[in-house]
A protein has these predicted regions:
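Alpha-helical cap/lid subdomain in secreted, periplasmic
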Residues: 43, 71-72, 90-282
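Core hydrophobic alpha-helical transmembrane segments of single-pass membrane proteins
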Residues: 9-14
Length: 282
């Protein structure tokens, strides 16, 4: 009887942990998201920066470079408008939150999940189950381009902000993998769009690829293992208190703990590119 009771308690504890982690990853919103409550706190003596994107901006399953900017940019009020698992489709749903902040500068880092959703039907279904895309939507390059162009047009029409767009971070550290080849294609579009629309272009992908090319090392895991690596990363970080850098090293990578997200080196590259853009455009 005691053994059964112990097993039941263990199962319940594991379910509670799973539910908590699911909420942490899938439902969490940054504390400095531009919602109504936070908009009331804006310091009118500062400029407003809104960082718009997915988990690589959100920073709760990835290094939080936005928090670095909050502590380093004394003359900016910094909002984090990143949400885990978002695609260009979902940025369009949330774009009114960015507009409401009346930003002076907007950074956009989006596309990793748009690419990831095209890699196999299981990933597409996961984004559907999370409610990021409709059941009838199959993400593709043409939709990505149309969505991104619409995001830029809306922001240009409804804000007076400077807009800085970033090429995609590496998707795993095998640069010859199909995921990275697709991310190259998506990033080439972003670069061209920046030129066509007179936007600031931040070459994140170029910077990360150069780092990996200059520091080659054999890989322990493939891109196909991403989902399980992500689960392990979240457990290591939130259950055992390990840093994203620790998880990165454990998984045999240099820039990412799980093929999709950023450690402090990769996140630092994003932070520094944004800071450079601000300094050049004061």
């Amino acid at each position: 009887m005691i053994a059964i009771y112990t097993i039941v308690c263990l199962v319940l504890a594991l379910l509670l942990i799973y539910f908590w982690l699911y909420q942490k990853v899938s439902k969490h919103i940054p504390e400095n998201y531009p919602n109504a409550a936070n908009l009331q706190k804006i310091d009118s003596n500062k400029k407003t920066l809104v960082c718009f994107g997915d988990s690589n901006t959100h920073g709760n399953v990835s290094y939080n470079w936005v928090n670095d900017l909050r502590s380093e940019l004394d003359d900016y009020w910094v909002f984090n408008a990143g949400v885990n698992s978002d695609l260009t489709y979902t940025l369009l749903r949330r774009i009114s939150d960015v507009i409401a902040a009346k930003p002076d500068l907007i950074t956009i880092l989006i596309g990793t999940n748009d690419v990831n959703a095209t890699m196999n039907i299981k990933m597409e279904k996961r984004y559907q189950q999370l409610g990021r895309i409709g059941k009838d939507i199959s993400p593709n390059f043409e939709d990505f381009k149309a969505n991104y162009q619409q995001i830029i047009q809306i922001l240009k029409q409804k804000t007076s902000a400077k807009i800085a767009v970033m090429s995609l971070p590496v998707m795993g550290e095998d640069l010859a993998h199909e995921a990275n080849l697709r991310a190259d294609k998506y990033s080439e579009f972003i670069k061209q769009l920046a030129s066509d629309e007179n936007l600031l272009y931040l070459p994140l992908r170029e910077k990360q690829k150069a780092f990996l090319e200059n520091n080659p090392q054999p890989l322990k895991h493939t891109f196909e293992e991403t989902y399980i690596l992500l689960n392990y990363s979240v457990i290591w970080h939130y259950i055992f208190g390990k840093s994203w850098d620790y998880v990165t090293a454990k998984h045999g990578f240099q820039l990412t703990p799980d093929n999709l997200h950023q450690n402090s080196i990769a996140g630092g590259m994003i932070r520094d590119l944004v800071k450079e853009a601000i300094l050049k455009n004061k």
